[in-house]
Amino acid sequence: MNEIATPQEFSDICPFSDAQFKEKMKELVAEDGFKHAVTWVMPDIDFDGFCKMLLQINTKKEFQENVMFDFLKLLAAKTTEGISYDNIEKVDQNKSYTMMTNHRDIVLDASFLNLALLYNHYRTTEVAIGSNLLIYKWIEDLVRINKSVIVKRDLNIRQALGAAEQLSGYIHFAITQKHESVWIAQRQGRAKDSSDTTQESLIKMLAIKGGKSTIDNLLELNIIRQ
């Protein structure tokens, strides 16, 4: 299935397209920082062989199914006593959703959600991740190869308003046009003291775009709050 082209207005925050995939992967494997990270996490890996395998991959879907799936299973085995979930059968595979959760680890929470989806042969979600975590260009490239959406942080008020409008527009586009689900944390920062409330500014951001009433703009995003 061919990807729907993403409008240029979202080009600096959206996941890389499959048309960009091989070029971006070639740039990534040449980065010293990427080599250091991979060999630190997997010290026994044949890095040159690993890179050769990566360069044979053509799409984000192939990358997630052939590389990230095994990595996430290994990560879950090393960091948890097991992952459990229920009611996944209630998620309609023919619909796209905005999945909102609290989070204690912005990487692991979304990763384990996508691991559950992969186990059940569902499409993975795109993952909204703050730009403050992307301290090197190669890290930003890696997460965008892996279906991440950039949430711009550390902006002045005027810039923040523009970024919120851009992000809202992209999420609406992803859900209604690309038919991709999106995961986003329900509040900025880690959940603390059993606080499980959704940040009001997040709801306002999601409702900016859609061209309808606030309620209808939210309804078209098919929000699942976990």
Which residue stretches match the model-derived regions?
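Membrane-anchoring hydrophobic helices of lipid-metabolizing enzymes
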Residues: 1-97, 103-114, 140, 145-147
